[in-house]
Each structure stands twice: as C-alpha cells, then as structure tokens.
Swiss-Prot record:
Pfam families per the UniProt record, alphabetical: FAST_1, FAST_2, RAP
Any coiled-coil regions, as ranges: none
Name of this protein: FAST kinase domain-containing protein 4
Function: Plays a role in processing of mitochondrial RNA precursors and in stabilization of a subset of mature mitochondrial RNA species, such as MT-CO1, MT-CO2, MT-CYB, MT-CO3, MT-ND3, MT-ND5 and MT-ATP8/6. May play a role in cell cycle progression.
Positions of the UniProt region annotated as Disordered: 24-53
Amino acid sequence: MASRLVRRCTCLLREAARLAPAMSPVGQPRLTRGAPRTLTSSATSPSSHLPGSLSELVERGQVFTPYPERQEVDHLIERATQPEEILALLGGGHCLHQNRAALMVIQLSRLLSEKPKDKALLIKDARFQHLLRLVNSQINAVWHGTLVKLLRSLYALGLPATSKELQSVEQEVRWRMRRLRYKHLAFLAESSATYMQEQGSQELLAELLVHLERRWTEIDDGRTVVAMMVKIGHLSQSLMNRLEDKCLELVEQFGPEELRKVLVMLAAQNRRSVPLLRAVSYHLVQKPFTLTKSILLDLAYAYGKLGFHQTQVFQRLAADLLPHTPSLTSSEVARCTKSFAFLKWLSLPLFEAFAQHVLDRAQSIALPHLCNMLLAFARVNFRPEREDQFFSLVHEKLGSQLAGLEPALQVDVVWSLCVLQQAREAELQAVLRPELHGQFLGDKSPKDQSTFQKLLHINATAQLEHPEYTGPHLPSSALVPRPSALDKKVTPLQKELQETLKGLLGSADKGSFLVATRYGWILDAEVLLDADSQLLPLRDFVAPHLAQPSGSQPLPAGAKRLAFLCWEFPNFNSRSKDLLGRFVLARRHLLAAGFLLVDVPYYEWLELKSEWQKSAYLKDKMRKAAAEELAK
C-alpha cells in the first residue's frame, strides 16, 4: 500500500510540475470560489490510475486559480491621476478581467476622495455606469480583499442605497462573510461602518458586528484591536467587551500612540474600564516611553474625563509637561489645567508655570481660556505666588467682558473669585442683580440647581466677607432650603457621627443633624453651649443662620454654636489633607457666621475602633474648639 501511495503521489507531482508555467510568477495559488475538489486515492476510481487524470480534472474545473500576470493596463490603473484616465480605459480595447474593473472603481474613489462635486458628476457619467455593470456581471469572481475595498469605494462615491450594483456588492459580501479573513472584516468595519449607518444597510452592519464578535480571538495585532475599539466599539456593547479583553491581552505590545488612542477612546465613550485603565497606567509608568507634548495633553484629558486616579502616572505627566509649558498655547494650558483640576491633582511647580504662562501672554490670552484656568485654580484652591499680578489681570479682563459671558459662566467665574478671596463689589453686583439670578430660581435642571447653589455662596460671601457691600442680594424667599438639598444619601461617616453624638447629648433637643443654612451649606450636626460649656436646647434660641426662624430667645452671654463638619475622601485634593476650594469656602463662611467648627476628617475617624474612642474624640474636639475661641 505504501509503495502504491508513493507512486501515485509522484505521478501527481510530475503533473503539477508540468502545469507550473501556466501559473503566476508569484507562485501563490488561490482557491476558486467554487466548492473545492479533493484529490483522493480510491480503489473504486479507476480513472485515478491514469497518468492524465490530473489534467482531466483541471480541464473540468481547476483546483487552483493562479493570479493573472500583470499587464500594462494594471500599471495604467495604478498610475492614473485623473478620473478621465481611468474611464478612458473602458474603450481602449484592454482586457478587463473580474478584478481590474473593481480596481478601476477603487482608484476612482481615491482620486475623488475630497471632491464631492466631481463624485456627483461621475455617478451620472455613462462610462461609469457601464463600469458598474461590468463589475456587477463579474462580482462572484472578485477577490476577497478587492471586494471589501470595492464596497468601501462605492459607499465613498455616494451611490444611492437603491443602486442595483451597490446592493449586489453588499449581498456578495454577506455571502462570503464566513470565508473572509478577519483583517478583511476589520477593514470593512473600520472604513464603512459609518457609511452603512447612513445608507441604511443595518442588516449588513449587524451581521458584520456579529462575525467580528464571534471571531475576536483571531485578532493578533494591537493596531487592529485599537482601530476597532475607536471606530466601531461603540456600536456593540458585547463586541466592545471582547475587544477590551483582547486589548488587555495585547497591551504589552502597545507603544505610546496606541496607549493614547485607547485612553482617548475610553474618555470619548465615557467608558471607565478599570482593568484596562490599570493595565495602561502600569505600562505608562514602567516603560521608558518618550511622550510627546500632544500625547501628554491627551493622557491628562483622558484621565481627567474618566476620573481615574493613578498617582505615579500623574507624577510623570506633571514632570514631563513642565518643560513643555513655554511652547504650549493658551488653549492647551487651559485644557491641561482643567484636566488636572478634575483629577484634584495639585502640582505646585506645574500650576505656577501655568500662572506664569498667563502673565507672559497677558495681552493675547482669550477670556474663555482665562475663565477655565480660574475655575481650575478655585477647584484645587491654588493661589499663585504672584497672585497680585495674576488677579489684577483677571479683574482687568473681566471688567469690560464679564457681562458678555453666558449667565451660568458669569456665576462660575465670580464664585471662583469668592473661593480664592478675590471677588470685588462690582463683580458681586453683576451676578446678584435680579435680571441674572432670576433665571435660576425655579427648580430646573441639575445644572441650573448647581448654579443657584453657587449664587447662594456668592450671596453669603457678600454678606459675611464684604461688610461694605450694599446690594443687591438674593431675595429672602430664595434662601429657604429646597427639599432636594437634604435628599442626599447619608454616608457611613455621617451616620456614625450622628449615632455617637446622640449618645453624648442624651436629649434630642440638645442637637440638630443635617442642618441646611441660608448660606447654601449643610451642617452635619449643630449644638449650642453656654459659657460653662453646658449643652443648651437649640430650638429655644434665635438662629440667624436659618432662613426660617425657630426660636425667640436671644443667646445667653458667652454662648457658643458648634458646627460639626464631616470631611470625606472626595473633599480633599488627591494624596493630600488639603480641602478642595469649595470646602475651604464653606469653613470660611461658617466661621464668619459665628460658628465654632468641629472638623471630622475621614482619615482621623477611621482610626477610631470603639464607641468609647469615638465619644472621647468628639469630646476632645469640642473642648479644643471652645478653648481656641477663649484664647482669641
């Protein structure tokens, strides 16, 4: 049996060698579209013993279709620089086999990629219509790679969805979907998904996404997975999950450009994939990449948009950006400052460089960029070393242009100046006038409610920190806390504080919890002490910090109001015990309103394990607050 098999294989090889000259010089045989024919050794097949059996088989239906030899027409198609050169080939007596006609359409699409008017004229050209019919008649013989490029080209040329030729190509792609290589599917998805949505080819797009998801394990390079995540990941949640898995598998191969694209894509889709963000962050820290200015800016934006905190990455971004600050534009500086403020990452050298950038370009910096930087500085409570010069420039710019800003932006800017203790009377008057604050008095969108909350803080700043300010103010009705002000979920720290404090007070009328003040701030707890530090019933005495009076008796001489404030982890700058600007403003207002403050930061409370320790901690805090007041 073995000898017979060897003789038969030798015969077949000899026949194949005889046919070799008919094949392409490339020497890469290609299977035909038809069903493959298998060469077998069967005793029941007498014809297989004949030496000419292979040639007969080739004559009946070739097993391999060789690539045709390149001819002059192929070079003419490739070198064409005008559509007319392509169309002229139709009447030149050239042999346009199944692939050449499709290649002509592809080349026409390339030449007219940025000429929409010429595309419309081309579609009406009779020669182009003839070319489309020629392609349609040979569509089943067009090679796979050419087929997907052909479909992309027809979309790009703007053929109507009702075009018979376009529908024919789409149908051919659907028939071949299982046999197309993954790179062909990926190319089609990257280049044509948008066209498919616009053309109404939803069925083809859906089928394409299904095949991409089923065969996701065939992806073997980082470029493909990154491109697909960027271009089509948002179209299918399940496909995006698979692509993220593959990205995690290949992320070690990524360079800085691929890492940038992944992060920007996640930020654009607001997709906070923690495992992927951790993997990308690890490689950014561990690998000695050279990060360009544009990559650094995009990374800062992406991390800021996603709110993903990674200390070592932020340290590297800040250190690498610092040498680039002289070459940054005002727009880039504002964008970068905003990104770091979202991350609550205060790098003093970098922020000082940003402030110096503003001073160096005092005459040319645009007001919107200056406003963005002011809001960022207020968020992290940053005041430059040259603050007099910096804020003089801010006031100079705002003096003539503040009224021209959007009402909400006017409020944001003046609120930021209040946080940084730089607000002037004219700026307070500009946002507290009825014509402006009246737009935000009703219960509207969350954004409007946030703006109104800032108006309360601005009004409190005018009352408590600017004794010379004469008005206008918000109306008394606007100072009444809204029901939504106390709707927030109680945190574990607040709950434990309330329980511990209730045990210390002994009586419910000796303290209040979650007190909404007329200044726009909420106290976690409030107690009243007499001159001997004994608890007094709150509801019996006047409370000027409340919008609605609760008692009639004046405070006894030497009485003190204590406000308990819980400071959670998000209230602080990243990796710092410094409060964000918003909460620094709250402390200032409450101190100016006559309160003694009992600060309860999370990092101190977490160290207390027993109820006894928590009670002793609060007693000690209350004694210290009273003692500091007496020492003044």
